């Protein structure tokens, strides 16, 4: 294998590792919010306070029961983030000739381009709005399909409708009662929720970064690093704020699909598919049921997305600096 190919492979692998680390951390920290969302969505009569009270009084672990399902959630979110970020990076690199952003860019050691100015808080590839929308949607759809079995197990394990004692027990019961198809229950609703969400998220995230970066740079004292980019602390603040704003906007748009998906995964016998689930929910509970758990989901999405993207961007930024220094030393030695 050539040295160039080896370096390219290691850099692609680093996007996977960076995504894995950021995903596991955010999942572990925010599992209580995810569990509460699942419990609230499983019944029209549930609310946050009642759910917390039930967990506190009925769970053998007390309030530690809020972390029930952390392992499948961390596995799903961790490997989902790893697969998503590495796939997204590959798609964005390949899409540069078709959807390159029209701003002045500099070639990065990772093979793409990034804006090289004091308003920029990122070293990720810069694409047009259309490019970001398509890249985010395709990457999320692919990652969602691969990780769907873990998603189903996670939702069932978190729900109070099932008394699974272990992840293996949950997987065995699903396989025994529903067959392999049971591991993909709700994939249609999940894909319709996640692919547009991810595409719109990447688009808005990049837009917010560009606009907030300009505001921060123009309203504060200069803080740039050696390559004239925004300083680390301000870059992290811009990235985190952009992640929160993008997640809030996307959560509102995609929540109906999330509510439908949860019903299908929890009660596949009653809610056989998206159409049946949507009709039943509308007839029995009204339009409000499609926004059940919105506050919890919005909170979790805002925090998890912002944490994951900020940590991912920071890891990639540090890696890019290391690769640049390594390349410079190699060139001087030749």
UniProtKB/Swiss-Prot annotation:
Ranges of the Solcar repeats in the UniProt entry: 10-94, 127-211, 234-318
Keywords: Membrane, Mitochondrion, Mitochondrion inner membrane, Repeat, Transmembrane, Transmembrane helix, Transport
Location of this chain's protein in the cell: Mitochondrion inner membrane
Reaction catalysed by this enzyme: glycine(in) = glycine(out)
InterPro entries: Hem25/SLC25A38, Mitochondrial_sb/sol_carrier, Mt_carrier_dom_sf
Coiled-coil residues: none
Residues spanning the membrane: 16-41, 69-95, 133-158, 186-209, 238-264, 293-311
Molecular function terms, GO-annotated: glycine transmembrane transporter activity
Domain of life (superkingdom): Eukaryota
Membrane among keywords: yes
GO biological process: glycine import into mitochondrion; heme biosynthetic process
This protein's record includes keyword Nucleotide-binding: no
Gene Ontology terms: cellular component: mitochondrial inner membrane
Alphabetized PROSITE patterns for the sequence: SOLCAR (PS50920)
Membrane-protein topology: Multi-pass membrane protein
A Pfam family that the UniProt record links to this protein: Mito_carr
Known function: Mitochondrial glycine transporter that imports glycine into the mitochondrial matrix. Plays an important role in providing glycine for the first enzymatic step in heme biosynthesis, the condensation of glycine with succinyl-CoA to produce 5-aminolevulinate (ALA) in the mitochondrial matrix.
Similarity remark: Belongs to the mitochondrial carrier (TC 2.A.29) family. SLC25A38 subfamily.
Name of the featured protein: Mitochondrial glycine transporter
Native organism: Pyricularia oryzae (strain 70-15 / ATCC MYA-4617 / FGSC 8958)
């Amino acid at each position: 294998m050539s040295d160039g190919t080896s370096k390219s492979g290691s850099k692609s692998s680093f996007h996977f590792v960076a995504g894995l680390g950021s995903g596991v951390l955010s999942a572990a920290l925010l599992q209580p919010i995810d569990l509460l969302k699942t419990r609230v969505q499983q019944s029209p009569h549930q609310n946050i306070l009642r759910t917390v009270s039930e967990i506190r009084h009925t769970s053998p672990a007390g309030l530690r029961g809020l972390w029930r399902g952390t392992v499948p959630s961390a596995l799903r979110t961790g490997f989902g983030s790893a697969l998503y970020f590495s796939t997204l990076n590959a798609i964005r690199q390949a899409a540069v000739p078709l959807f390159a952003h029209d701003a002045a860019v500099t070639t990065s050691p990772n093979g793409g381009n990034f804006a090289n100015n004091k308003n920029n808080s990122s070293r990720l590839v810069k694409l047009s709005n259309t490019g970001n929308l398509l890249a985010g949607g395709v990457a999320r759809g692919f990652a969602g399909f691969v990780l769907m079995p873990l998603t189903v197990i996670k939702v069932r394990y978190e729900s109070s409708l099932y008394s699974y004692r272990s992840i293996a027990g949950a997987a065995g019961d699903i396989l025994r009662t529903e067959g392999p198809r049971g591991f993909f229950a709700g994939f249609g609703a999940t894909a319709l929720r996640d692919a547009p969400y991810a595409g719109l998220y990447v688009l808005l995230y990049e837009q917010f970064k560009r606009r907030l970066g300009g505001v921060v740079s123009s309203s504060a004292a200069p803080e740039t690093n050696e390559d004239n980019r925004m300083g680390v602390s301000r870059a992290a603040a811009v990235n985190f704020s952009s992640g929160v704003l993008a997640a809030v906007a996307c959560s509102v748009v995609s929540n109906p699909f999330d509510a439908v998906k949860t019903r299908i995964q929890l009660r596949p016998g009653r809610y056989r598919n998206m159409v049946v689930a949507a009709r039943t929910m509308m007839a029995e509970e009204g339009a409000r049921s499609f926004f059940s758990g919105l506050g919890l989901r919005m909170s979790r999405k805002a925090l998890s997305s912002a944490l994951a993207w900020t940590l991912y961007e920071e890891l990639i930024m540090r890696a890019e600096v290391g690769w640049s220094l390594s390349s410079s030393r190699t060139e001087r030695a030749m």
